[in-house]
Amino acid sequence: MQNSFYREIVNDHNLRPAHKHDLPGANMELRGVNPSCGDDITLYLYVEDGIIKDGAFTGDGCAISQASADMMLDLIIGKRKEETLHLSELFLRMIKGSVSESELDELEEAGALIDISHMPARVKCAVLGWHTMESLIDPKIIEAEE
């Protein structure tokens, strides 16, 4: 990360993740693994009436995977499933280096991971939580990617 402000955001989410805990009462749960890096998370969501009311994750991994999952949950809690999938699509496009400035603003703190697009070895780390969330909310997305 070139920008120290972005680095600080990532470090804060890695060292003090607000959403890294069990979530009793979650009605959706899925494990995501990145075998190339050893990242292993389980994502928990509580969804009611199509809105993500709460979310959490557990597991271990590198700073990027842990921070990304925490930032993602900050962003998606309180959103409708459709909005969440839109944000995920923006995040994945950002990681590939193809988002506009206004789209980047929609990602809030998750936009701090923009420089990952220049670090191919870290891309899978950054997208693990997002892919896990997509699989949980809309399994058809993952089937289409395979």
Model-predicted segments: where are they?
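C-terminal binding/interaction regions
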Residues: M1-K20, P24, K79-E146
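Ubiquitous "structural anchor" signal
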Residues: Y46, A67-A69, E134-I137
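Alpha-helical support elements that line or immediately flank enzyme active sites
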Residues: S68-G78
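Active-site phosphate/pyrophosphate-handling residues
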Residues: I41, D70, K124
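Alpha-helical macromolecular-interaction surfaces
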Residues: Q66-A67, H86
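Secondary-structure capping and boundary motifs in well-ordered enzyme cores
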Residues: C37, I64, A121-R122
